[in-house]
């Protein structure tokens, strides 16, 4: 029996129309464009500012584009998984809402929560469903409305984040392509450094939690930066060595778009020139689970069938990892 691999056969993406610039941010908090660009690398970020719209809205836009580009029949979709830290509701899952919006009658669906590392976990999870031989078409989506949890009076965090979504189609192949390997890690000791204080079962919503701004993202930036650099660098180097990849045979690295200095540090550790590293943080900011697929959406036309790509990310938990992918097709599929 031939080995079944899980290959990426298409990508779709969406970012909201409204753009929040550094100039506008500087009117909210004590900062400026030069500081934000130098320290974070963000020039602008897209914000979903229409009332009553959440992550499922952006996920639907991305997935609809994906299905059009790949020519997928809604009845043929077996599974939908959404990685998000900003679900529409605590329940039901954003994935189930997305299935309804896409008219998928034969798919089952669930959410996956691994913060900014969510899409890495999605790729490995979906790949294993494909490898089982029981599933033929899987849509995976990273979607986050980070503006819903950002405190726009906190100069340390509000310049960093944006909203967006992107999706991959994953299908079986017997070619030597697709998700080839992964190294995924978790360390729950990271809780104090990156979390939302209230809103869960430990500290349910109350007048007190709202009045004390406990429903916003809390991040201890210096600690997170240090862990992100070391973790992403180490795991990227490890997966390259494990698979016999060198700086010459790696075609692309797709890092989580959290901070341009983290991205540059990972490239330096891997001895890779920055022209092999996909970077779009300047225009989107950190869209959490959406950063990795949004990078592919932006740079799809650069990719060639058989390209060796290392995806790497770091997020709350702490969660981190790397996924090695051999790309499945040439160039950009038109929508």
Swiss-Prot record:
Where in or outside the cell?
A: Cytoplasm
Which Gene Ontology molecular-function terms are recorded?
Answer: 3-oxoacyl-[acyl-carrier-protein] synthase activity; beta-ketoacyl-acyl-carrier-protein synthase III activity
Cite the entry's keywords alphabetically: Acyltransferase, Cytoplasm, Fatty acid biosynthesis, Fatty acid metabolism, Lipid biosynthesis, Lipid metabolism, Multifunctional enzyme, Transferase
| Keyword Secreted carried by entry | no
Main subcellular localisation: cytoplasm
| GO terms for biological process, alphabetical | fatty acid biosynthetic process; secondary metabolite biosynthetic process
List, alphabetically, the CDD domains matched.
Answer: KAS_III
UniProt cross-references to Pfam families, sorted A to Z:
ACP_syn_III (PF08545), ACP_syn_III_C (PF08541)
Active-site residues per Swiss-Prot or TrEMBL entry? 116, 256, 286
Q: Give me the reactions it catalyses.
A: malonyl-[ACP] + acetyl-CoA + H(+) = 3-oxobutanoyl-[ACP] + CO2 + CoA
State the GO CC annotations. Answer: cytoplasm
**Cystine residue pairs:** none
* EC number of the protein: 2.3.1.180
Q: Where is this region: ACP-binding?
A: 257-261
Pathway named in the protein's UniProt entry: Lipid metabolism; fatty acid biosynthesis
Matches recorded under HAMAP family: FabH
Subunit structure as annotated in this protein's UniProt entry: Homodimer.
Domain annotation text? The last Arg residue of the ACP-binding site is essential for the weak association between ACP/AcpP and FabH.
Q: What is its biological role?
A: Catalyzes the condensation reaction of fatty acid synthesis by the addition to an acyl acceptor of two carbons from malonyl-ACP. Catalyzes the first condensation reaction which initiates fatty acid synthesis and may therefore play a role in governing the total rate of fatty acid production. Possesses both acetoacetyl-ACP synthase and acetyl transacylase activities. Its substrate specificity determines the biosynthesis of branched-chain and/or straight-chain of fatty acids.
The record's comment on protein family reads: Belongs to the thiolase-like superfamily. FabH family.
Task: Supply the name of the protein.
Answer: Beta-ketoacyl-[acyl-carrier-protein] synthase III 2
**What gene is it encoded by?**
fabH2
